[in-house]
Amino acid sequence: MARSYDTLWRLIYGGNIMLREERNLETIPVGSLGIIPLEGCKALGNKVNDYLVKWREESKNEHKSTIAFSGYQRDTYIVDAKVPRFGSGEAKGIINESVRGDDLYLLVDVGNYSLTYSLCGQVNHMSPDDHYQDLKRIIAAVGGKARRITVIMPFLYESRQHKRSGRESLDCALALQELTSMGVENIITFDAHDPRVQNAIPLKGFETVQPIYQFIKSLLNNIDDLVIDSDHMMIISPDEGGMGRAVYFANVLGLDMGMFYKRRDYTRVVDGRNPIVAHEFLGSSVEGKDVVIIDDMISSGESMFDVAKELKRRKAKRVFI
């Protein structure tokens, strides 16, 4: 049987046994790299591109000359793309070069309010909804021709609406499902409000990069007299939402932890929420200690200021947010 298979192989290939180059799965790229930073993320996109150009020029790789590495080393990896708007305020995505077979990375900052557009004679600031729609327009312009699409979204769109309370929409889950249905394979974000939202797309890639290491490194590099032990420092969660992160910080650094809980007046609604009556503290004394406040998200910042003031009233030494 083995001889017959060998004979068949020789007949098909005219007696020439073709030597196959073994695929190096650790280094071989999925496709030619392409970066599309949307308008609100141009600065970050340019920095990423400059780093990659320099790194690939300096890196040594024995496989660079193979056909699989075609387009590996280039002057730029940024794809020429734009999202112009019509006079009606509507827009369209345009890609001015081929992305067929490319490994595309789309960068979008949905929280960039500095961008504006004109509509009916009025200047409008771009909202997260506008940025998200532009992202979908670029994905639609790709037309399914890319080998793989990865979306890098530093602030996860609709991450505040990650769970349902009553008759509410699950916007974050819907957005993730919509992106993956359009062909997105991976979504990369930073410190998602609730990483469990990835349950909406269990068969696709979802990475939430935690900033804990960078935060601790920044503290140590900039505060010379910082002493990290339970006698000199304490981790504080301003509410129940930041508990998970605060517990992790405290365990990593070997520190005690305290928390505040928001006492609300549920008989009234002000600006769409129940007003906070007081911040009640649970934990040991903070007197004379440096305290680090760890929260999951800052919106207006009012609660963070109130917590910091209360900690100083309790004679905390320094407050780091």
Kindly give the residue locations of the regions a language model identified.
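PRPP-associated nucleotide enzymes
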Residues: 1-321
